């Protein structure tokens, strides 16, 4: 097993590039924007809108190379309208005519998110698949966040990984227009 180093990060460009590469084959990303060259720009827009700004952003390194990232939002976090407005041009650039699909996703999942305060794992992705990067990022995050946690798995193959960290599937949601399925998952507070 490779020993990875986890570092906190404020480098939105680096994190966006990692996530853009990590999600190149993601079913939801493909539905949202088939042009994989725009993925890093889309994650940059999401980070500009505020994801991770008050929570934690971890980068997983193998030697000196960044190979994964996780973005957590703290309980009660809602991006400010100013940050969201600042991100609109980035969203439009990344999504083009598919901007409405991004809004649909946000609107759909608002109803599945837990009402009680919780940590939200907005994104976790690895450029090295199947090598323990995701597990390392999840372990670090789960050791650091206190209280319940929530995520939306866009890939059914990742559900067993999240289940190993105590998450359970709470619903199965199919996106419109012949879209893929997404699985909201929740983990109660330890104890």
Where does each model-flagged region fall?
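A short beta-loop-alpha structural element at the N-terminal edge
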Residues: 3-17, 21
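Conserved acyl-donor/pantetheine-binding loop and adjacent beta-alpha core of acyl/acetyltransferases
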Residues: 69-129, 176-180
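Conserved GNAT acetyl-CoA-binding A-motif
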Residues: 115-122, 144-155
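C-terminal "cap" of GNAT-fold acetyltransferases
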Residues: 151-159, 175-191
């Amino acid at each position: 097993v490779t020993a990875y180093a986890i570092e906190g990060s404020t480098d939105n460009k680096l994190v966006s590039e990692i996530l853009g590469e990590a999600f190149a084959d993601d079913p939801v990303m493909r539905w949202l924007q088939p042009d994989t060259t725009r993925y890093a720009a889309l994650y940059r827009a999401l980070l500009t809108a505020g994801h991770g700004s008050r929570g934690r952003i971890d980068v997983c390194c193998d030697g000196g190379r960044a190979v994964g990232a996780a973005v957590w939002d703290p309980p009660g976090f809602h991006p400010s309208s100013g940050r969201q407005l600042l991100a609109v041009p980035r969203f439009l650039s990344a999504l083009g005519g598919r901007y409405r699909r991004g809004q649909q996703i946000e609107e759909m999942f608002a109803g599945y998110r837990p009402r009680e305060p919780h940590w939200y794992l907005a994104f976790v992705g690895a450029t090295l698949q199947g090598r323990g990067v995701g597990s390392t990022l999840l372990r670090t995050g789960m050791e650091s966040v206190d209280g319940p946690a929530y995520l939306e798995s866009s890939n059914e193959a990742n559900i067993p990984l999240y289940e190993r960290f105590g998450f359970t599937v709470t619903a199965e949601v199919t996106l419109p227009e012949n879209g893929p399925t997404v699985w909201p998952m929740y983990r109660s507070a330890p104890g």
